[in-house]
């Protein structure tokens, strides 16, 4: 298969095996007479798959003889999974065949109850009991957790979402009200326990979003141009103009943000057309370029003059500016020891305790203790931060879109506009009893925030990340 970029993927067949070269990586897959895959071989080694006579998989053996096994009952339902990282996970079923109980290697139990229509109506997990309700149209109507979090949904006559109210712990809540026009969301109104926040207004062109306004006045995002591939090439966000460029294959080559003639962001990118890997990125404002290299599995091996090496199972064994990594023999993907080369890794203890959902419950470091609360879906809804047992900050979260915090520095509300924390072009901020203020966000091609700009075009913050996404 040849592409206009010059990239070429190849496939060859021999009896029950397929050998492919995709993105420059060679791989051979072998199948049994039933069409089940029995092995995959690539430059990292061979992974084998073993089956019972009835076709159920009983084990997977990864490079390094890392083995995961599966057990079943007389009905062919999976009852155990023995994972070298997680330990033994056990499953039990109700009389209708639904998974009713899951027990992890630490003995933590998750229970689920279903109605006669196989809909989940109750879940007990991580010390919480969550009850689910449905309306006559079989749409989710409520999720209520014993820890005080909940979600309430209403719908219009066409079964489109009309309102969504998310209640957090401590009586905090956020409500979204949707208005639909011609099958698209035309308005989205936000309100919280503190008061009304704002309404976003959406305009469409041929069914595609073309503009977002606040309260039918301030334009916070407006599409101005696209290329022949349908990729966005021009956007206005308030006073800022944004220009995006691409190579012939659609890979990004540049992102420029200006306030008039003043350049705020000017980033350049170059990708390998055959593998899709990023060759280099450049901050054209500061004339700083970072080059990247990869191995035959497309893993990052060199970055900004530094190097990384890997074992056959994919574990990082060395980063030249950090140190060497040693892994647990019984849990082969778990780091047991880092031997640092310098000061990149702080020489102090950090303790993390996880809940049943394998999410951090507390993080303790350098006199600080962060405690996290989750809703019935396992999403973070609150962080409490203390230092020397004194509260420094309480921060509440709603779906990566709205945050409220209060602490020694005062209170703050944050609402991401036209998207969430990972995609929004603007953010609405209110500090203390002050007025709501719009800030515009510039991002790199991965979506990480690089610049924060006020509504007058003044730069308020600039951020930079290393090759691993760490703030620097």
PLM region spans:
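Residue-level markers of secondary-structure register and packing in elongated scaffolds
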Residues: 2, 30, 34, 38-41, ...
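Short, solvent-exposed loop/edge segments of extracellular or virion-exposed proteins
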Residues: 338-342
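Extended, non-globular alpha-helical segments
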Residues: 413-418, 422
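Ser/Thr- and Asn-enriched, surface-exposed coil loops between beta-strands
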Residues: 12-18, 184
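GD-rich hexapeptide-repeat beta-solenoids
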Residues: 9-13, 133, 322-332
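Proline-centered turn/helix-capping motifs that create local helix->coil transitions or kinks
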Residues: 244, 316-328, 406-410, 472
């Amino acid at each position: 298969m040849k592409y206009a970029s010059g990239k070429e993927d190849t496939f060859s067949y021999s009896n029950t095996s397929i050998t492919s070269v995709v993105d420059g990586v060679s791989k051979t897959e072998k199948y049994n007479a039933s069409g089940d895959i029995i092995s995959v071989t690539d430059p990292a080694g061979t992974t084998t798959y073993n089956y019972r006579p009835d076709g159920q998989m009983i084990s997977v053996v990864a490079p390094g003889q890392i083995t995961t096994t599966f057990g079943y009952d007389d009905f062919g339902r999976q009852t155990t999974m023995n994972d070298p990282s997680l330990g033994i996970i056990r499953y039990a079923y109700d009389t209708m065949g639904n998974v009713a109980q899951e027990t992890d290697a630490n003995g933590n139990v998750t229970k689920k109850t279903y109605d006669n229509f196989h809909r989940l109506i109750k879940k007990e997990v991580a010390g919480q009991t969550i009850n689910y309700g449905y309306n006559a149209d079989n749409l989710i109507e409520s999720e209520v957790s014993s820890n005080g979090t909940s979600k309430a949904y209403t719908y219009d006559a066409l079964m489109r979402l009309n309102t969504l109210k998310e209640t957090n712990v401590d009586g905090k809540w956020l409500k979204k009200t949707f208005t639909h026009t011609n099958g698209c969301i035309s308005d989205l109104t936000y309100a919280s326990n503190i008061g009304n926040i704002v309404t976003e207004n959406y305009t469409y062109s041929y069914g595609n979003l073309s503009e977002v306004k606040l309260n039918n006045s301030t334009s916070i995002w407006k599409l101005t141009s696209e290329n022949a591939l349908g990729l966005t090439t021009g956007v206005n966000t308030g006073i800022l103009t944004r220009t995006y460029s691409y190579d012939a294959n659609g890979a990004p080559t540049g992102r420029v943000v200006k306030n008039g003639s003043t350049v705020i962001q000017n980033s350049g990118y170059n990708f390998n057309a055959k593998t899709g890997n990023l060759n280099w990125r450049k901050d054209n404002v500061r004339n700083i370029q970072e080059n990247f290299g990869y191995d035959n599995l497309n893993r990052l091996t060199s970055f900004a003059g530094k190097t990384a090496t890997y074992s056959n199972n994919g574990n990082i064994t060395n980063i030249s500016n950090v140190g060497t990594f040693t892994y647990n023999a019984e849990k082969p993907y778990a780091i047991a020891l880092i031997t640092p080369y310098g000061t990149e890794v702080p020489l102090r203890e950090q303790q993390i305790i996880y809940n049943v959902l394998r999410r951090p419950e507390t993080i303790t470091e350098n006199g600080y203790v962060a405690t996290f609360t989750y809703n019935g879906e396992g999403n973070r809804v609150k962080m409490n931060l203390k230092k020397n047992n004194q509260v420094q900050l309480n921060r509440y979260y709603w779906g990566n879109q709205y945050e409220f915090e209060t602490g020694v520095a005062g209170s703050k509300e944050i609402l991401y506009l036209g998207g969430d924390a990972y995609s929004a072009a603007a953010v609405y901020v209110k500090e203390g009893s002050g007025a709501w203020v719009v800030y515009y966000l510039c991002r790199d091609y991965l979506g990480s925030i690089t610049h924060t700009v006020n509504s007058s075009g003044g730069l308020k913050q600039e951020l930079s990340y290393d090759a691993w996404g760490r703030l620097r």
